[in-house]
Amino acid sequence: MQENQKNTKKEIYNLNKLQKRLRRNVGEAIADFNMIEEGDRIMVCLSGGKDSYTMLEILRNLQQSAPINFSLVAVNLDQKQPGFPEHVLPEYLETLGVEYKIVEENTYGIVKEKIPEGKTTCSLCSRLRRGILYRTATELGATKIALGHHRDDILQTLFLNMFYGGKMKGMPPKLMSDDGKHIVIRPLAYCREKDIQRFADAKAFPIIPCNLCGSQPNLQRQVIADMLRDWDKRYPGRIETMFSAMQNVVPSHLCDTNLFDFKGITHGSEVVNGGDLAFDREEIPLQPSGWQPEEDENQLDELRLNVVEVK
């Protein structure tokens, strides 16, 4: 009996610690990019996956203690895929008491009609889904659209564009929608996928499979994801350093003439960002930038159990 109580206390402690870290990550991203402002109505796009469930939970949590007032409305797009469990999200959201809207659009049928058998359907499906979500945001009077992409997604997109697209381009935490009418935010931009996975497992969210349409994972993205996971395992801190690099760009030491006026460098020009000192042997820190030791999720500090609960 005592052993069971100890395990339960340990689980509660670890969940609270994890939730605090996710809250901190989301709060920092919101502040850094001014994602949420006074009076905002945030449309939280809920797919039924671990990321969007976590995003909704953390935003609800922050809503209670934030110094500004904002409202949330959860939106799910039922695309009429075979086997889609229509009851899961409404039942879950009803238990939370969250305002929500289920949008029913047979995009699955449109995609099947337009795309030949065996060809990838993701591109057309994504465009259709995006248009519907933008329309829904307008109908609901939403000022921001929140998507559940996390830090790993952002890094994967950076490497996809580098390896296959020839661009240094990632996935911005905040942007103007392609129709020019909506601001899209990614509150999980600073969150690690493994933290989100642990949180979703601990909270036992009612996960809906993401491959009901029969589509296969993007092979190129999967290769990048495997590469990053391997690096993270073999070289602790590398992921943090790469993400820090995305926030610390030095255009004068790259090759994009649109970002820096290389032609304008003449005799008498000022030294920019250290000039050629960048090519001298630099002192490399013992630990990568932004790296912190992995926390042991199995440790239990019973003295702290009563003070770490997230309200």
UniProtKB/Swiss-Prot annotation:
EC annotation from Swiss-Prot or TrEMBL: 2.8.1.-
Motif stretch (PP-loop motif): 47-52
Q: Which CDD domains match?
A: TtcA-like
Q: Spell out the Gene3D superfamilies in the cross-references.
A: HUPs
Keyword RNA-binding set for record: yes
A GO molecular function assigned to this protein is: ATP binding
Query: Mind listing the UniProt keywords for this protein, alphabetically?
Result: 4Fe-4S, ATP-binding, Cytoplasm, Iron, Iron-sulfur, Magnesium, Metal-binding, Nucleotide-binding, RNA-binding, Transferase, tRNA processing, tRNA-binding
An individual GO BP term? tRNA thio-modification
Superkingdom of this entry's organism?
A: Bacteria
Disulfide-bonded cysteine pairs: these are none
What is one cellular component GO term in this UniProt entry? cytoplasm
What NCBIfam families would the database entry show? PRK10696.1 (NF007972)
Q: In which pathway does it act?
A: tRNA modification
Describe, as the record does, how this protein assembles with itself and its partners. Answer: Homodimer.
Gene name, per UniProt, is: ttcA
Family to which the UniProt record says this protein belongs: Belongs to the TtcA family.
Other remarks on record? The thiolation reaction likely consists of two steps: a first activation step by ATP to form an adenylated intermediate of the target base of tRNA, and a second nucleophilic substitution step of the sulfur (S) atom supplied by the hydrosulfide attached to the Fe-S cluster.
* Pfam annotation, one family: ATP_bind_3
| Name of the protein in its database record | tRNA-cytidine(32) 2-sulfurtransferase
Entries under InterPro entries matching the protein: Rossmann-like_a/b/a_fold, TilS/TtcA_N, tRNA_Cyd_32_2_STrfase, tRNA_thiolation_TtcA_Ctu1
Cofactor binding mode and count? Binds 1 [4Fe-4S] cluster per subunit. The cluster is chelated by three Cys residues, the fourth Fe has a free coordination site that may bind a sulfur atom transferred from the persulfide of IscS.
User: Is Mitochondrion given among the entry's keywords?
Assistant: no
Describe the function of this protein.
Catalyzes the ATP-dependent 2-thiolation of cytidine in position 32 of tRNA, to form 2-thiocytidine (s(2)C32). The sulfur atoms are provided by the cysteine/cysteine desulfurase (IscS) system.
What is this enzyme's catalytic activity, as reactions?
cytidine(32) in tRNA + S-sulfanyl-L-cysteinyl-[cysteine desulfurase] + AH2 + ATP = 2-thiocytidine(32) in tRNA + L-cysteinyl-[cysteine desulfurase] + A + AMP + diphosphate + H(+)
Its subcellular locations are:
Cytoplasm
Listed cofactors:
Mg(2+); [4Fe-4S] cluster
